[in-house]
Amino acid sequence: MEILRGSPALSAFRINKLLVRCKEHLLPVSDIYAEYVHFADVSTPLNNDEQAKLTRLLKYGPSLAEHEPQGHLLLVTPRPGTISPWSSKATDIAHNCGLSKVLRLERGLAFYIHAPTLNDEQWQQLGALLHDRMMESVFSDLKQAAALFSHHQPAPFKRIEILLQGRQALEEANVRLGLALAEDEIDYLLEAFNNLGRNPTDIELYMFAQANSEHCRHKIFNADWVIDGVTQPKSLFKMIKNTFEHTPDHVLSAYKDNAAVMEGSAVGRFYTDANGQYDYHQEDAHILMKVETHNHPTAISPWPGAATGSGGEIRDEGATGRGSKPKAGLVGFSVSNLRIPGFIQPWEEEFGKPDRIVSALDIMTEGPLGGAAFNNEFGRPALTGYFRTYEERVDSHNGEELRGYHKPIMLAGGIGNIRGDHVKKGEIIVGAKLIVLGGPSMNIGLGGGAASSMASGQSDADLDFASVQRDNPEMERRCQEVIDRCWQLGEANPILFIHDVGAGGLSNAMPELVSDGGRGGRFELRDILNDEPGMSPLEVWCNESQERYVLAVAPEQLAQFDEICRRERAPYAVIGEATEELHLTMNDRHFNNQPIDLPLDVLLGKTPKMLRDVERKQVEGTPLQRDDIYLAEAVERVLHLPVVAEKTFLITIGDRSVTGMVARDQMVGPWQVPVADCAVTTASLDSYYGEAMSIGERAPVALRNFAASARLAVGEALTNIAATHIGPLTRVKLSANWMAAAGHPGEDAGLYDAVKAVGEELCPALGLTIPVGKDSMSMKTRWQEEGEDRAVTSPMSLVISAFARVEDVRNTVTPQLRTGQDNALLLIDLGAGNKALGATALAQVYRQLGRKTADVHSPEQLAGFFNAIQELVAAKALLAYHDRSDGGLIVTLAEMAFAGHCGVTVDIASQGEDTLATLFNEELGAVIQIPAARRAEVDAILALHGLADCVHYLGQAEEGTRFTINQGAEAVYQESRSTLRRWWAETSWQMQRLRDNPQCADQEHIARQDDNDPGLNVSLTFDPKEDIAAPYIAKNVRPKVAVLREQGVNSHVEMAAAFHRAGFDAIDIHMSDLLANRRNLQDFQALVACGGFSYGDVLGAGEGWAKSILFNARVRDEFAEFFLRPQTLALGVCNGCQMMSNLRELIPGADLWPRFVRNKSDRFEARFSLVEVDKSPSLFMNDMAGSRMPIAVSHGEGQVEVRDDAHLAAIEEHGLVALRYINHYGQVTENYPANPNGSSNGITAVTSTSGRATVMMPHPERVFRTVSNSWHPEEWGEDGPWMRMFRNARRQLG
């Protein structure tokens, strides 16, 4: 084993945070230093050249200090017997670099700790703080890492002796294996195996438990119900299905696949033909929708829990029909109170929690990062979401009890597109090859389906932790590329049938695949890809290793499928064949036995049906006590409540521009304020049709009125999505995610009433369909503390996600107020005169619940509201729109003022004298801003839709900072907009300070309070409407551009589209094509290296990609020859920029180029940043010098690193800087967030001395269309100014 030191692993502020954690755990640690250390398992000793190559390969990240580290060593490595995702990718890079003697690379994190007084027990405590016990181990010596490369012998399966020991043997196995089997299921299995005349194997029982868990079978939603002694006519699921029976319009697939599908638009989908050339293909892009939850894993281990939640939902989308394309995501969190240190709020009492779960603060620190990281690396923008906190002692139908989200809600959902001929799955023919596509089996995520079906605290702590999966999004990206190549073949698609691998692992996915296809299956255990040979058959078959799909492929198409997988470097294994007989057989050639030999009907047959016999329980509650509520204090408190407060800390960590098809993200207007009501994407890169999604949820209301809470969730989703141009209400489709503490007194009956209110009443009345959803029925946490039983029970929580086809994405209206003309602010109040304050944000911040809550008072008025807003949107009669929701009218107005950077003066006298109720009630409705001149027209449209009595004139938006609310002649509330904005932002700021570089967080918080900030602005030195490439395109000559990607790159399609529009033939070139000599760069006039996460940023962002070129002699020469050839152009963007900066030795005139390293914030940054084009030789930026314009930024490692000040000065003196970050005043800046990575002198793009090669961190390809800019001047046409770059390239090539 070779040992090689790596780069420093933790920044100074990360070290400080670690020291603070030590102090919190009473561990007297004075100093910590951390660096990466690499371990290489080699077949034979490396020679000097190989050693030098390996040393250079493993040199990445910040420069390593010369000194030998001092202190007590704690070495954290992956768990012996496992192979980490880092190892797989680093080893791939080594092999691609010709280091064939390297069998495997692995990486550890060496902590050198100064703590002379720690005893053995404290050292163990410290070790526990530093590692994830499910995935990592701790050693005290570097040489002990040799255990990473030890090999273990496979373990055999075990039989459960029921023939001799009977029921007792099954009961013991139930507890030992964490199967969560009910009494009647134990009886069922006992009878089934007695009839078979044999003992079950452990793998068969585990497989049954996962396939029949509440998580997978949804027993409660399919149960029979008796409430208060009365048998109910329908199950919960039948009431949901009633919405489809009532309104099947526009739904193409419901309830029978991994996601639902509704009609989309006929557009030009942009992808490659059989020769790798990109072009538009006119076809239907139908819309798929799915929303999942991943609550249990997120409570145990937030980052991987949330990451695999997003990853699983993405796989659901990709595995719909015969393969489809995930497109854009949403995410949501409900947790207990944050209790931010130094920022604990008056309503946040400490109620305790069990040790096995993490705190709400930990969840919201790590969970969103995990979800965002997966979406980022996969290449899916996350565009909307919600965040609620609730934890309180309330008076309920069970007396006083604790309600909250100790078991959190982690919501992951999204939209995608699918071809019409692939919506329905194909036929699995007998003899079809049964395939696992994706990563290897690892001993993680065992029993997730069963574990998530139990109330937290019922299962064993080790089983809880074992049930959390770990993520590898770059692997999932590779698998999706395979699926994309398959569906793009149309009728020749080799995929007959596909499912994702989720809860229960292959033990659930493979039986589901063959059963759904009307077949059985015959499998070979040892053909499953396996990174841990020591696993038992149960562990191989049932683990929930992520990023896997199961497929059926016809034997005659296997060679084609193999070719696609090899090109994309996506691992796969043929593990069996489909059989005529409905039977599962698994052979194990290592032990020459059969761990599984089971009829499918035993596994998936008619297991006992559940009966829920429950009672309704209700409590009236006490009215809100208002004596101690003062308006000024109430406003500040409500603006601090997370459900109301700014959520920038949750948003800028997620890529919101990838695909180039994002028309409306969360950030609104020139000041990029996160207040958008819905997310909108374009259906393609050549149209204005699109898709929209929004969220609605009002969970605390269920503590008083279950049905009202459900109705409000539907209503809020509608008032949110109404902001874009949809058309008829029947175009909107809903996903319903139901969370409840089943078995908790009163909750079951309340759940039934809520489902009935939505499925049988409201949705049919509105013509709405719920074709997809999910339930999580174990939302209760139990534990013991100080000798007494404790429990925190979640409110019944319905999260509604609304999805719709969009007629014209350009008509989407935002909350940004306009002040350039006479205007009017109108409140459309759907409260029908009600101003209930029960279960509002106001009640929560004063630790009350109240009595009466908001509700949907008239489905007809709600439908009229939606239709009226749609008419106004289509007529372009609205200047701004924002729904009324959490926090009430005052929050709606404040957020609109924040987005417009203006003042507001309103009069609420027309709504009665109860100021508090008027401002803080959360009845459905919206505030619209209209031109004063169109008031009569707008009033007429509202009246036509039955809303005349709902409309109140409030006042107007105006220049300045004053926020004034009058009650007739009296000003009842006055405050500056900047003060309100500061209060609203403080929760996000405090979370950023805890999680990221506090210096950056402070700079952003200060910047928000600048009343004079002019916002994003544009000053161009050219006309973006001028097509300077047109004369060259007219010659009918299209130069070829190699659109270069490596595994993990995710921005190549929009890049190809930009070059295609500029007159190039864009050709898809995978690095595997060059390494295998299938393609050669001599055939191209231009090359573009695209953005993403090549190799998951293993060995440094872009560095592994670069070294696979530099260390492969033939490919190195090919690149060198291309760069030397005159009349060629090369562009590197984001990951491609990082990669090309490491190829500078091959690029003439690039020897001064810097490296790009970790952002100063130490966080992935997704921003819409203002840049200025510098005068430079760059041929891409020709005639653009002096222009200022915003551009999409999405990266974690974009900070320019130079050797010293002289190096920086040389770059400047040679005029190689092509782009710089500037602030809104037009000044070059290093301040965050105007400069999102902290680069010196604002540098974000450099060029070679000839100008033929340019590298840049921002993404021009994602904003070449005006419509994909988060904000833009209204006069821009189809093309945004960044299109000029690509047309410049076309002009240069003549």
Curated annotation (Swiss-Prot):
<dbReference type="InterPro" id="IPR041609">
    <property type="entry name" value="PurL_linker"/>
</dbReference>
<feature type="active site">
    <location>
        <position position="1261"/>
    </location>
</feature>
<keyword id="KW-0067">ATP-binding</keyword>
<feature type="binding site">
    <location>
        <position position="677"/>
    </location>
    <ligand>
        <name>Mg(2+)</name>
    </ligand>
</feature>
<keyword id="KW-0479">Metal-binding</keyword>
<comment type="function">
    <text>Phosphoribosylformylglycinamidine synthase involved in the purines biosynthetic pathway. Catalyzes the ATP-dependent conversion of formylglycinamide ribonucleotide (FGAR) and glutamine to yield formylglycinamidine ribonucleotide (FGAM) and glutamate.</text>
</comment>
<feature type="binding site">
    <location>
        <begin position="305"/>
        <end position="316"/>
    </location>
    <ligand>
        <name>ATP</name>
    </ligand>
</feature>
<dbReference type="InterPro" id="IPR010073">
    <property type="entry name" value="PurL_large"/>
</dbReference>
<dbReference type="Pfam" id="PF18072">
    <property type="entry name" value="FGAR-AT_linker"/>
</dbReference>
<keyword id="KW-0547">Nucleotide-binding</keyword>
<feature type="region of interest" description="Disordered">
    <location>
        <begin position="303"/>
        <end position="325"/>
    </location>
</feature>
<dbReference type="InterPro" id="IPR036604">
    <property type="entry name" value="PurS-like_sf"/>
</dbReference>
<protein>
    <recommendedName>
        <fullName>Phosphoribosylformylglycinamidine synthase</fullName>
        <ecNumber>6.3.5.3</ecNumber>
    </recommendedName>
</protein>
<feature type="binding site">
    <location>
        <begin position="384"/>
        <end position="386"/>
    </location>
    <ligand>
        <name>ATP</name>
    </ligand>
</feature>
<keyword id="KW-0315">Glutamine amidotransferase</keyword>
<dbReference type="GO" id="GO:0005737">
    <property type="term" value="C:cytoplasm"/>
</dbReference>
<feature type="binding site">
    <location>
        <position position="716"/>
    </location>
    <ligand>
        <name>Mg(2+)</name>
    </ligand>
</feature>
<keyword id="KW-0658">Purine biosynthesis</keyword>
<dbReference type="Pfam" id="PF02769">
    <property type="entry name" value="AIRS_C"/>
</dbReference>
<dbReference type="InterPro" id="IPR036676">
    <property type="entry name" value="PurM-like_C_sf"/>
</dbReference>
<feature type="binding site">
    <location>
        <position position="885"/>
    </location>
    <ligand>
        <name>ATP</name>
    </ligand>
</feature>
<comment type="subunit">
    <text>Monomer.</text>
</comment>
<keyword id="KW-0963">Cytoplasm</keyword>
<dbReference type="GO" id="GO:0005524">
    <property type="term" value="F:ATP binding"/>
</dbReference>
<dbReference type="InterPro" id="IPR029062">
    <property type="entry name" value="Class_I_gatase-like"/>
</dbReference>
<dbReference type="Pfam" id="PF13507">
    <property type="entry name" value="GATase_5"/>
</dbReference>
<comment type="similarity">
    <text>In the N-terminal section; belongs to the FGAMS family.</text>
</comment>
<dbReference type="InterPro" id="IPR055181">
    <property type="entry name" value="FGAR-AT_PurM_N-like"/>
</dbReference>
<feature type="domain" description="Glutamine amidotransferase type-1">
    <location>
        <begin position="1041"/>
        <end position="1294"/>
    </location>
</feature>
<dbReference type="GO" id="GO:0006189">
    <property type="term" value="P:'de novo' IMP biosynthetic process"/>
</dbReference>
<comment type="pathway">
    <text>Purine metabolism; IMP biosynthesis via de novo pathway; 5-amino-1-(5-phospho-D-ribosyl)imidazole from N(2)-formyl-N(1)-(5-phospho-D-ribosyl)glycinamide: step 1/2.</text>
</comment>
<feature type="active site" description="Nucleophile">
    <location>
        <position position="1134"/>
    </location>
</feature>
<feature type="binding site">
    <location>
        <position position="883"/>
    </location>
    <ligand>
        <name>Mg(2+)</name>
    </ligand>
</feature>
<dbReference type="Pfam" id="PF18076">
    <property type="entry name" value="FGAR-AT_N"/>
</dbReference>
<keyword id="KW-0436">Ligase</keyword>
<dbReference type="InterPro" id="IPR010918">
    <property type="entry name" value="PurM-like_C_dom"/>
</dbReference>
<feature type="binding site">
    <location>
        <position position="720"/>
    </location>
    <ligand>
        <name>Mg(2+)</name>
    </ligand>
</feature>
<keyword id="KW-0460">Magnesium</keyword>
<dbReference type="GO" id="GO:0004642">
    <property type="term" value="F:phosphoribosylformylglycinamidine synthase activity"/>
</dbReference>
<dbReference type="Pfam" id="PF22689">
    <property type="entry name" value="FGAR-AT_PurM_N-like"/>
</dbReference>
<feature type="active site">
    <location>
        <position position="1259"/>
    </location>
</feature>
<feature type="binding site">
    <location>
        <position position="676"/>
    </location>
    <ligand>
        <name>ATP</name>
    </ligand>
</feature>
